[in-house]
Structures are given as structure tokens and as C-alpha cells.
Amino acid sequence: MTTILAIETSCDETAAAVIENGDTIRSNVVATQMESHARFGGVVPEIASRHHVEVVTAVVEEALEKAKVTYQDLTAVAVTEGPGLVGALLVGIHAAKAIAFAHGLPLIGVHHIAGHIYANQLVAKLQFPLLALVVSGGHTELIYMEKDGQFQVIGQTRDDAVGEAYDKVARALALPYPGGPNVEQLADTAEATLDLPRSWLEKDSYDFSFSGLKSAVLNRLNNDKQRGIVTDRAALAKGFQESVVDVLVAKTVRAQAQFNVKQVVLAGGVAANKGLRKALTEAFANKDVTLLVPPLSLCTDNAAMIGACAHSMWLRGIAGNMAMNARPGLPLSSF
């Protein structure tokens, strides 16, 4: 049996979890900073780092207490190594190093995006080869995994990540941070849809582009304002969301067919979007494919996903050392 303490501080959530055997959550504690960043309309790196410093010890202690384990019960300590905000990452890494050194435990550095994918291991057993659609504030990627721990990025955003596009459109629509859930909530009230462009790029490309769609929203708002027209904000939000979902789902379906995988997993903060979850479920309903969609608690940043990924690494004999450092631009291909 393995019992891993995992720590995640890559952005604005301070999280710790205890994961047993890679698929059982003994505890999963998250301290959010959302209110602190909301008035700025986005995450302020220095504020995020300071908040992590203030609460990381208490969050770790709460995770251990809820799991009813002590440091002596642990097999290893895992922590997000990158990518993310360098100052935020360092807080978690130093906390993990201190625990590992003090208690003679192995230290495992985990890639944040790999963690999002392995969050699905806490839902059902991952079956390789598989295809992962990762959608978050900083990432939009289609990833083919031929086997456990092997990542091939077959498509990625060329400009804005989908979560970033949601935040920018939310600001344009005078909606509060975070943008994703607020744009979705507004779209749900729409009685009509304003048709917006879909960016398909080259015929065979699995890459994404959302800057043009974002610009189309801004242009519609500006043109309506100049003409004295009151924009139907709900219809515009719905049109934006439908455009995003159509492209994400279509490229995922095409990649599944080309790579002939039997399991598709959804991962990342934007995986919480009801419209995307519904569209993917419908797209694969009549296909010989298993679609894994994590519960909402495992979509946004958390440490349980880091622990699940760390368990896979532990079984493959992968561990770090005390020289580990923050790697804010860590590519998944080199992980």
C-alpha cells in the first residue's frame, strides 16, 4: 500500500491531499484565494505567493488530520514542480522539501497538467492508449498517451487558452472574475444566440485558436455601442460558448477516430463547464469509447490529482531529489 501526501501551489489555490494506492482520496483540502484576486480581474502573482506562505502549513496539517495519518504513515511526498507561477510553485516545493527532509521521505515532482489528466484515475482506471482534452486557464491541449507516463501533445492553442479567452470575454461583458462560470451562467439565460465564427485552422490540424473569437465578441460590443444598440449580452455569451465547445468537441472526436483510442478523458478547470461536458458526452454516446469526466471538485486545481499522478510515477520508479526547483515553463513533452 502507498500513502502519498501531495501539495499543489502552482497558481492561486493552496492545496494538500492524502492519496492511497493512487485511486483513493483520504483527504483533499483546498484553500482558495478567489476573493483576493477578484477585484483585480485575475491572479496577481505576488499576492498568490504571499497567501500560499500564510496557509500552506495549516492546509497540510488539515489534510493529514482529515486522513487520520501521520508523517510516519507516508510513503512519499509529492508536489507540483511546474508549470505555473514561479513564486507560487516555490512555496509548495519548499514545504514539500522540508517535510521530505525532516521525515526521510522520497520527494516526487509532478507536472501540473499530468496531474489534471490523472485526476481521472480517481474516477476510474485509466486505459491506455487514451486521448486527453486538457482545458484550463493557461492550457488548451489534446494529448495522446500511448502508455502510462508517455505524453504526446498533438494539438495546442496558438494564442489564448480557452480559460483565458473566457476571462477576457467576461471582462468585456462586465462580468466578475472568474470568467468561466460567469459567462456560462449568463449564457444559460439566453433566449437566442448570436452566431460567432469558429476557428478550425488547417484541415488536418488539432491546434486551437481563440483570439479571433475573442476579437469577434469585442467587435460586436464596440459596433453595437457606436450604433446605439443595446447588445444582447446573454445571446453573445451563448454564441461565444457554443463556438468554443463546437471546436473543442469536433477536434477531440476527430483525434479519437484517427488514433483509435477507446478512452477519452476530460481534464482541467474548464472541464467544469456544463455545456462542454454535455457536448462531449453526446458526441461519444454511440461510439465504442469510454469518456471519463472528473467531478467538479477535481476539475479545478487540487492536490488529489497530484497525488494520483505521483503514485503512477512511484510505481515506475520515478522520484526527485532535494535539488528540485520550480520550473514555471515545464513542457509536458519533457516530463
From Swiss-Prot:
One of its GO terms (molecular function) is N(6)-L-threonylcarbamoyladenine synthase activity. GO terms for biological process: tRNA threonylcarbamoyladenosine modification. It catalyses: L-threonylcarbamoyladenylate + adenosine(37) in tRNA = N(6)-L-threonylcarbamoyladenosine(37) in tRNA + AMP + H(+). It is found in: Cytoplasm. It comes from the Bacteria. Binds 1 Fe(2+) ion per subunit. Substrate binds at residues 134-138, 167, 180, 273. Its cofactor is Fe(2+). Pfam families: TsaD. Its EC number is 2.3.1.234. InterPro entries: ATPase_NBD, Gcp-like_dom, KAE1/TsaD, Peptidase_M22_CS, TsaD. GO terms for cellular component: cytoplasm. Fe cation binds at residues 112, 116, 301. CDD domains: ASKHA_NBD_TsaD_bac. Keywords: Acyltransferase, Cytoplasm, Iron, Metal-binding, Transferase, tRNA processing. Belongs to the KAE1 / TsaD family. Required for the formation of a threonylcarbamoyl group on adenosine at position 37 (t(6)A37) in tRNAs that read codons beginning with adenine. Is involved in the transfer of the threonylcarbamoyl moiety of threonylcarbamoyl-AMP (TC-AMP) to the N6 group of A37, together with TsaE and TsaB. TsaD likely plays a direct catalytic role in this reaction. HAMAP family: TsaD. This is tRNA N6-adenosine threonylcarbamoyltransferase. It comes from Shouchella clausii (strain KSM-K16).
